[in-house]
Design a protein with these regions (language model features):
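Bacterial Sec-dependent N-terminal signal peptides
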Residues: 1-36
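Extracellular beta-rich repeat passengers
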Residues: 35-105, 115-128, 135, 140-242, ...
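Extracellular/luminal low-complexity Ser/Thr/Pro-rich, glycosylation-prone repeat/linker regions
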Residues: 38, 467-473, 480, 517, ...
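Solvent-exposed, conformationally flexible loop/turn segments
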Residues: 77, 478-484, 567-571
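Short beta-strand elements of extracellular/lumenal beta-sandwich folds
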Residues: 477-512
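Serine/threonine-enriched low-complexity regions used as flexible
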Residues: 489, 573, 577-602
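A surface/secretory-pathway sequence property marking extracellular, secreted
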Residues: 502-504, 508-556, 611-616
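Low-complexity, intrinsically disordered segments enriched in Ser/Thr together with acidic residues
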Residues: 550-586
């Protein structure tokens, strides 16, 4: 039967938007997002009828794929500009280096096979070299094993290493993992964050990975200090021996990544990696994990650096958005029937440790032993805005709901003693926990014909919807007699869509104080339009012109006007003044409470903020 590639009829226009949210509650947290496409859903895929972006170019069954017999053997060092063409099949024998100042171009549809009979057959793009491997949706470039269908194994060949001249926190001439430290061509690092190593698009990497020793492994795709001038999107790493993707420093931005049934971690970030990753899928194989005596298999593993005190700079600060990470617990169907993995090295959906400042947003972590584990220093970073786990869904975290008999003897240690549960469930972070994971996605349980889109008929309905969260900025919380202070109320939309419909903000007037709206002389029960202005103290504009204000039963009420919508990752700021009444005695304590409702908010648990007031 002839294979026909049917291009998706629905295309998503990729835009670049820089958005900043500032939360001012008990602490200040800043979320800065660059190169991020706003979505109306959590996880890697939009709901149907939008096709999955994995259609056509991925392969869910590479073990049985037929590839051509090699016609060209490549070894040693490529020292001049070279093009590999789709009418040939290339065999990598041993470690093949692309020399500095040399460009390797690979045509769409080309197949490259790593020789499984030669130790560490691999492709290394040196600093200053370029790889231009741009496949297409219908003609992806494939790097795979030299073995015949049915006999391929993880680690049949080494994988791809790209070395750049961007920043890391170890130095400017650092040996890359997976190759001996004495090899001068296996070095990465520099001082050029915008360094360009070429492009890797619509590429599959299969059966790669190699371990020289513990913590010195070659991954399916290893990125050492790769700069933001490099283009990486639509890359599938399948059935690898170590990690699927590992970043050692660098600032490259990536989109549309697939980590499929790899042995160790799906996404590993180290040594100051600072790029942005959006739209990614990680799927575990319950029969294949790392050896827990050496390492454990995670969805994310993130470290700042490998040795205490973990304070090297620049710090690991990558940002991940819209990731679907599926652990090793498998459901027999959407109706249930969960079975535990046979391999014993699986642990966490996300392991954030060693002072990392990694951020994960708008993502799904499901069917793991543990959903999220953060070291104490990472929890501290998050409190200061240096790490984040926000607006995510954890489906069936077995730390808290261990309903599976632990026949393997794996100890469910109390790892989450560092404050992770409190951080995870803090309403301000907008996370949800779902106890019924099997029907979150349309069909996550087929390895050969999956559908990883949200299942709107099941638990996947929780993957979309708005999330309005208030924040308070107040000039002072300690008032002298008759003192007036400026008050700003920020209404953030941190959910997976714009607010929809009327938003209502309710503020009980604190006892002993008067709450007023600039430009409105007297608040009454009749809603009155506000006027936009700028806070003199905070030098911040406020959006009162989008709101009507009234006073009813001791409550100041603000309602958004018709047609006003707070955009995803945006905010609307309301400006007030608050005054201590002349008769209010010293030593008075009061509470300022802000509550927001409406706007199609699907997570009402985090819809209030408060601030203590006192007098002297």
């Amino acid at each position: 039967m002839e294979y026909v590639c049917v291009l998706n009829k629905i295309k998503i226009k990729m835009t670049t938007k820089i958005l900043t949210l500032t939360f001012l509650l008990a602490i200040t947290s800043i979320v800065a997002m660059s190169q991020v496409v706003p979505t109306t859903y959590r996880g890697a895929f939009a709901p149907a009828p939008t096709p999955m972006w994995t259609d056509n170019w991925t392969n869910w069954d590479p073990q049985n794929a037929s590839y051509g017999t090699p016609t060209v053997t490549v070894s040693g060092v490529i020292t001049s500009n070279t093009t590999w063409t789709k009418n040939n099949v290339y065999l990598l024998q041993g470690t093949v280096y692309v020399d500095s100042l040399v460009t390797l171009t690979i045509e769409p549809g080309t197949v490259i096979r790593g020789d499984a009979n030669v130790v560490i057959s691999s492709l290394v793009i040196q600093r200053g070299a370029d790889i231009v491997a741009n496949g297409t949706e219908c003609n992806p470039i494939v790097f795979t094993s030299s073995k015949a269908p049915g006999s391929r194994l993880r680690g049949d060949w080494g994988g791809i290493i790209i070395e750049g001249r961007a920043l890391n926190n170890l130095g400017t001439n650092i040996p890359i993992e997976g190759i001996g430290a004495a090899e001068p061509r296996a070095r990465h690092g520099g001082v050029s964050p915008n360094d360009n190593s070429g492009s890797l698009t619509y590429v599959r990497i299969e059966f790669a990975g190699f371990a020289i020793a513990a913590n010195n492994e070659m991954n399916s795709l290893t990125l050492g200090s790769v700069g933001s001038g490099t283009t990486i999107h639509h890359v599938q790493c399948s059935m690898g021996f170590d990690d699927a993707f590992e970043w050692f420093g660098g600032s490259v931005n990536c989109t549309h990544l697939v980590a499929y049934r790899t042995l160790d971690d799906d996404f590993d970030t180290d040594n100051g990696y600072s790029g942005t990753v959006q739209f990614a899928l990680g799927v575990k194989d319950p029969a294949v994990s790392d050896d827990p005596a050496q390492s454990t298999s995670e969805g994310w593993e993130s470290d700042n650096n490998g040795s205490s005190p973990f304070t090297l700079t620049p710090k690991t600060s990558a940002k991940f958005y819209n990731v679907t990470q599926i652990g090793a617990f498998r459901c027999s169907s959407n109706a249930g029937g969960i079975t535990q993995p046979t391999a014993i090295g699986f642990r966490r959906g996300a392991r954030l440790r060693r002072n990392t400042e990694l951020e994960i947003h708008n993502s799904i972590l499901m069917n793991n032993w543990r959903g999220l584990v953060m070291d104490a220093d990472v929890v501290a970073n998050a409190a200061l805005g240096g790490a984040a786990f926000q607006n995510n869904v954890i489906a069936m975290d077995y730390t808290f709901s261990s309903t599976i008999t632990n026949a393997t003897g794996l100890a469910l240690a109390a790892e989450n003693v560092n404050g992770t549960p409190a951080y995870l469930t803090n309403p301000a972070n907008g996370n949800n926990v779902i106890s019924t994971p099997c029907d979150v996605l349309v069909n996550a349980w087929s390895f050969t014909n999956p559908d990883y889109r949200p299942n709107s008929a099941g638990s996947g309905a929780a993957l979309s919807g708005g999330d309005l969260t208030p924040g308070i900025q107040i000039q002072t919380a300690l008032f002298a007699a008759n003192q007036t202070a400026e008050l700003l109320v920020d209404i953030f939309e941190i959910g997976v869509g714009n607010s929809n419909g009327t938003v209502t903000v309710t503020i009980p007037v604190p006892s002993g104080f008067t709450l007023a709206v600039p430009s409105i002389a007297t608040l009454t029960s009749t809603p009155t339009s506000g006027t936009n202005g700028t806070s003199a103290f905070f030098a911040t504009p406020y959006n009162n012109g989008d709101w009507n204000f009234s006073l009813s039963g001791g409550f100041v009420i603000a309602t958004s006007k018709a047609g006003v919508s707070i955009p995803q990752f945006g905010l609307s700021t309301l400006g007030f003044t608050i005054k201590r009444n002349l008769a209010t005695p010293a030593g008075t304590n009061a509470n300022l409470v802000i509550t927001v409702s409406g706007g199609s908010d699907s997570t009402p648990a985090n819809n209030s903020a408060n601030n203590s007031l006192s007098t002297y």
